[in-house]
Amino acid sequence: SVQLANPDLVGLNVTIPYKEQVISYLDELDKDAAAIGAVNVIKIVRQKGKTRLIGYNSDVIGFTQSIEPLLEPQHKKALILGTGGASKAIAYGLKKLGLECKFVSRNLREEMLTYDQLTPEIMDEYKVVVNCTPVGMYPRADEYPNIPYQYLTPNHLLYDLLYNPDTTLFMK
């Protein structure tokens, strides 16, 4: 195991696509990670000859602290692009900030919208759009999520979780 091979290891990060799958290997979840259903940080605790793995989700903290100062009175509802582990943390954080959320997926699912269902009325109703997909990430930086950009206004707030490249086409 990793713990035996690296006795000095005290923790590690988890990224897509493993944020949800890793939960079954953990001994404990912090309350936010349990509510979100996704983990991106694992703390390794060694006590009395036993090793315990504890899962946390720091995505929600980083996201809410960075988006909260950008929110204005018209930002009451958010579209969340993607349905993976990161999107769950984003929805959890936005709800804590008082926003109503709707997921957008490529595939038709209950309680979600597809990209084809993003009408002018929906885009007008949901003034915050958060990209939680890998679309537009290096090395495919020439791509962007398939939303109707023509319906965006200066009252919209777009937020991209991707960090490579620094500015994605979604944000331009």
Language model segments and positions:
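Glycine-rich adenosine-cofactor-binding loop
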Residues: N57-V60, I67, L71, H75-K95, ...
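Rossmann-like NAD(P)-binding element
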Residues: E121-E143, L152
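Short glycine-/small-residue-rich Rossmann-like dinucleotide-binding loops
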Residues: P17, T133-V135, L162-Y163
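Phosphate/diphosphate ligand-binding glycine-rich loop within oxidoreductases
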Residues: S1-L70
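NAD(P)-binding Rossmann-fold cofactor-contacting core
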Residues: K96-T114
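Rossmann-fold NAD(P) dinucleotide-binding segment
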Residues: Q21-S24, Y138-L158
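Rossmann-fold NAD(P)-binding glycine/threonine-rich loop
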Residues: P154-K172
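Short, conserved loop/helix-junction motifs that constitute active-site signature segments
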Residues: P73-Q74, K95, I122-D124, N146-H156
